């Protein structure tokens, strides 16, 4: 298979972890006889500094013409600390999602046995946690009509039937591939938009008779995720709720540096770690590259290259078992490994496998 990959390293630690993801992808492609080419493009604060736009048209063209985007992270404190800034790095991420029609964010939540002690939850609660959060990405309050003056402000949580149907279809199909349990998260007791979500989900559920579908208010779901994370298999929800719940779910594993994600939809899919740009660690060779590397595994799996994805996951598991880890997840007496060293260890493992 031939892969044409757009690489958007972004800001902060992005360029460092991006290199590790590319190196792993190249090693796997060589191992399995695939051809791969990369085209690099700017985004985020880096793009604002260079051209004044966090997602310039040239970057969009690169992404649009690729088979997949390997994205790292955007964000810079100089924008976070300036409330008057009209253009911000995160706007580039929203623009990419909108322009590429990326309406579904797929975020796995799982634990690694050797790192269960890193979770803030008790081991017996998280040891069997393995679920997927599916978040609608291009509708709701983040994209609805907005207004603000000195005395009032509002954001509109606007959704249409086609927007809801397409994300629910993704969720039901994921549930069919897994343990056949789907939880639809909403606030239907208060919000009209949530009542439409629930109505449409109830209409679609009979088309998937093998899937057990249940419905949960978002506040209850937030509690259930902490009290009994193993209850969930596939969870689907709207944009704002999903933004909050996916971050809550990310702490279950014990480190945001372990979790990848995918955003899919009408055009080129995007694969990225869930963590941010961590500008304080830029250039220090301490950032955990595993989420970026596991994003490459998700990329291969998206294209039905299951053996390739499985090999990457096996290599990551082996690195953790051998205590080849960056500082934030290393054992007390473990050797010191940096971003580059962890990435190279995984590349070497893949080549020898």
From Swiss-Prot:
Enzyme Commission designation: 1.1.1.85
Q: Which PROSITE patterns match?
A: IDH_IMDH
Q: Which cofactor does it need?
A: Mg(2+); Mn(2+)
Q: In which pathway does it act?
A: Amino-acid biosynthesis; L-leucine biosynthesis; L-leucine from 3-methyl-2-oxobutanoate: step 3/4
> From what superkingdom does this record's organism come?
Bacteria
The UniProt entry, under InterPro entries, shows: IsoCit/isopropylmalate_DH_CS (IPR019818), IsoPropMal-DH-like_dom (IPR024084), Isopropylmalate_DH (IPR004429)
What SMART domains does the record point to? Iso_dh
The processes (GO biological process) annotated in the record are: L-leucine biosynthetic process
Q: Which family does it belong to?
A: Belongs to the isocitrate and isopropylmalate dehydrogenases family. LeuB type 1 subfamily.
* Residues carrying the site annotation Important for catalysis: 142, 187
Main localization (coarse) = cytoplasm
Record text on cofactor binding: Binds 1 Mg(2+) or Mn(2+) ion per subunit.
Which catalysed reactions does the entry list for this protein? (2R,3S)-3-isopropylmalate + NAD(+) = 4-methyl-2-oxopentanoate + CO2 + NADH
Main enzyme class: oxidoreductase
Stored NCBIfam families: leuB
The Gene Ontology CC terms held by the record are: cytosol
Q: Assembly state and interactors?
A: Homodimer.
- What function does the entry list? Catalyzes the oxidation of 3-carboxy-2-hydroxy-4-methylpentanoate (3-isopropylmalate) to 3-carboxy-4-methyl-2-oxopentanoate. The product decarboxylates to 4-methyl-2 oxopentanoate.
Where in or outside the cell it occurs: the entry states: Cytoplasm
What is the name attached to this protein's record? Answer: 3-isopropylmalate dehydrogenase
One GO molecular-function annotation for this sequence?
NAD binding
Binding positions (Mg(2+))? 219, 243, 247
Q: Where along the chain is substrate bound?
A: 97, 107, 135, 219
Gene source species: Bacteroides thetaiotaomicron (strain ATCC 29148 / DSM 2079 / JCM 5827 / CCUG 10774 / NCTC 10582 / VPI-5482 / E50)
Higher taxonomy: Bacteria, Pseudomonadati, Bacteroidota, Bacteroidia, Bacteroidales
**Which UniProt keywords are given for this protein, alphabetically ordered?**
Amino-acid biosynthesis, Branched-chain amino acid biosynthesis, Cytoplasm, Leucine biosynthesis, Magnesium, Manganese, Metal-binding, NAD, Oxidoreductase
